[in-house]
Amino acid sequence: MASAPVDPRVCSIARTLDIVGEKWALLAVREVFLGNRRFDEMVHRTGAPRDTLAARLRTLVAAGILERRQYCEHPARFEYHLTDAGRDLYPVILTLMRWGDQYLADDDGPPLVLEHRCGHRLVPQVICQACGDPVHHGESKTAES
């Protein structure tokens, strides 16, 4: 039997997508993870329209995902840094990257390969925090909170 529909106003996925569900928002977060914290770097590396990227950065700052830090007074210039909430998006970014690498990479392979500190290629997976087993579709169910 299917579960009851989830009210989109109280769904954590819908709420999250309201903030990061737009292409330029997640690409801005990706850039900060990669160490590109300045607006002009982000515009150059993402190809985002300046006004659109500026709007997404304002949203991410207002949501507490990024924070602005001034690095130059004259003229005033800012860098963007991840907050704890922003750093918690790292598994999301990695999982999206893994999916894209698996289903959308061209013949040359993925455009960016990450290596774990152990020296092996990083292949992220979702695991159960309690038992450490990988989590697969169909192995979880909704529970009362």
What are these regions (language model features)?
Residues 39-71, 75:
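Canonical helix-turn-helix DNA-binding module
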Residues 26, 63, 92-103:
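Alpha-helical linker/hinge and terminal dimerization helices associated
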Residues 45, 79-81, 113:
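Short aromatic/hydrophobic contact patches that present stacked aromatics
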Residues 21, 72-95:
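Basic, amphipathic "hinge/linker" alpha-helix immediately C-terminal to the N-terminal HTH DNA-binding motif
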Residues 1-8:
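N-terminal intrinsically disordered/low-complexity leader segments
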Residues 101-145:
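C-terminal regulatory/oligomerization modules of transcriptional regulators
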Residues 29, 37-42, 57, 89, ...:
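Extended, folded domain segments that form the structural surfaces/walls around functional sites
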